Amino acid sequence: MVLPLLKVGSLLIKSLAKPLSKQIKIRASKSPIFHDRVVRGARLWHKLDLKLTKFNGDTTRKPVDLNVNAAIDLGTEIVSEAFLLSVAIGLLLYETSRSSEKDKKKEEALQNRFKNLEEKLEVQQETINNLTNVIEAIQSSNPNLNIYIDPNQSTKSSIAEYINTHNIKLNSLKNAQTENDYKSISSEGIPNKRISNVN
């Protein structure tokens, strides 16, 4: 997102450069104080440019002072470029700050999601432990039972069905009228029951 904004900013700077320079020239012609500051700043910049050129080994340029018109042209160009550069830097800083804030919100949302998942896993693990204790209690009270985990069925419904089935069988044994009835019910045995994992 930063690069598109920079492109828009560069186009904006190019479109505003000439009108801004023109307005600075008009203001410099009407205001003596602003005129003097623009001319003085332009001449100082020109002298610095000459010194840097000489320091780099270029001796072809002669140290000539700028006249008023040339100084105004250079000064207005410097002021307009400095202003537009500050606008571009401001846009860049704003976009960088906005992108950073957006990334921060995404990271916070991701951290909250991980936290919620961890809490759900803890609840599920606690449920599994409780159901495991129930299964162990049933097996300890009925040593001949063979209860194992079936991931394709619901644990709670399977346990309820298991208990209900054995309650019916125990009631049938208690209510058996004859020895044959008792043997018939007992011969069926206690079926093995599949207990599933928690969904």
From Swiss-Prot:
Lineage: Eukaryota, Amoebozoa, Evosea, Eumycetozoa, Dictyostelia
Organism: Dictyostelium discoideum (Social amoeba)
A single BP term in Gene Ontology: regulation of lipid metabolic process
Family matches, as InterPro entries: OPA3-like
UniProt keyword annotations, A-Z: Coiled coil
Name of the protein in question: OPA3-like protein
Alphabetized PANTHER family for the sequence: OPTIC ATROPHY 3 PROTEIN (PTHR12499:SF0), OPTIC ATROPHY 3 PROTEIN OPA3 (PTHR12499)
Coiled-coil ranges (or none): 98-141
Coiled coil listed as a keyword: yes
A GO CC term attached to the entry: mitochondrion
Record keyword Coiled coil present: yes
A Pfam entry, by short name: OPA3
Transmembrane segments: none
Family the UniProt entry places it in: Belongs to the OPA3 family.
